[in-house]
Structures are given as structure tokens and as C-alpha cells.
Amino acid sequence: PDFAEREAARCLSCGSACLRCVEVCPNRANIAIPVPTGGASPFSQGLQIIHIDDLCNQCGNCGFFCPYEGKPYEEKSTLFSNSSALEQSTNPGFAFIYTEAGKGEKPALLVRTNKALLAPAGPEKLDYKDWQAKTSTDPIIALAWQILKEHPYLLSDQTRQS
């Protein structure tokens, strides 16, 4: 358990990004997202890897080529297209929850943190106001905020209807 906790912390706070998992993924399921650093940001490096669940076929390339013996397809923060995909997985990650009104709405966030790797638990649902308040303290929630605000193209139409 100590190893998993250290690796989760290392990946999210590491001062360097090798990006090997991004380079070797044949489906482009691992991408590097620029994130703010310093100040109130929970990140120490300007790039974070996000794993996109819908694009991954779990070929294992990212794990095979990882110089840190990681398994990015299981360990990196994962963007799920809907709540049921997140609930069926054990990966740390999140899904945006919209009502039928959809676009323009401030979504709730369904999130499973890296700590779930140690003791898998069900995801936690946070209302928009609640999860927005945690963007400076929780790396996964901060990453979700970056995707929502700066990379909405990663959110499929299915995401907007979940």
C-alpha cells in the first residue's frame, strides 16, 4: 500500500514529465494537459497526464514503456464519459454529470481520488459549488476543472447527456 500511495503522489506532484505513456499509446488515450503551477495550484509541474477511458483498449504499451514501472492506464487520473463507466472501473478519475438541460449548465462531478487505489471505494458526487471550492487542494479535482474550462473538446456529447 505504501508503494501505491507514493506512486500516486509522485505522478501528480513530480517535477518532471517523461510523457512516454503519451508517446506510445496507439489510441491516444493518454494526453498531456497544461496546468497552472505555483500559488494555490496543487501541481508542481506544468503538464499532467490525463487518461481517456473511452479511447483505451488496455493494450499495456504505456505500462510496458513506463520508466517508473507504472501502469498509466490504471493509475493516471482518468476522464470517464459517464457515471456508469466510472462506477464500473477502479481507476482514479472523474466524470462530469449534467442533467438533461445539458450545455451551459454547471455540472456536478463524480470523482474517485488516487487514495481509492489503496482502498477501493465508491466515487463521491460533488455539486458544482462544492467541487469548484476544492480545485486548489485536490489534484484530481483541479485537473477536472482544467478540462472543463480549457479543454471542453475532450467532453463527448455522451458526457453532456449523462
Label each residue range with its predicted role.
Residues 21, 25-26, 60-62, 66:
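A structural signal for short beta-strand/turn segments enriched in small hydrophobics and glycine
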Residues 43-55, 61-161:
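Flanking helices and flexible, charged tails adjoining ferredoxin-like Fe-S electron-transfer domains
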Residues 1-55, 99:
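Ferredoxin-type iron-sulfur electron-transfer modules and their immediate structural context
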